[in-house]
Amino acid sequence: MTDFGKYLTDYLNRYLTMECGCSYQTVKQYSATFMLFIQYMYKIELIAPEKLFLKEITKERVLGFLHWLEETRKCSISTRNNRLSALRSFFKYLQYREVKGMAYWQAILSIKQKRTPFKEMSYLTTEGVQALLEQPDLSTRKGRRDFILMGLLYDSGARVQEIINLTPENIRPKFKWIMQQ
């Protein structure tokens, strides 16, 4: 096993879950990043996984990987930045485990996130909101429920998850406000 394999296994299987408390989904996404990175190193840099040592991973190769994601795989800047975040997390971890390569890790950590184009948020018009609120069938129980939920979302500006997390104890009709816990 290479030093890269050893540290990557520890990073994914122990460090992220036990020390950082990352979710299963985060570990899955970080694993996917490293699968792509290993694929890049093999296909483009011609370094087989069983010959991939930490000394082979340079800032230039990481930049090449990020360029490959955008140009060859047609990933968005946002996806590229997410992949970079996963790599940066690994190299932060390495700073405390493999100090001999500190200069290499810090060079990789100096890679900046790309700016993503600003996306203007679109909103429903007043007519659109009115049309949406007219959709539930108020003669049925589910229709009345849906109408109340949509009205609460609209009036409060709350996120769907915030509404889902509400319990009866949070609602104070006497005071005309909802208490969030």
Model-derived features: positions:
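Conserved catalytic core of the tyrosine transesterase superfamily
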Residues: 1-181
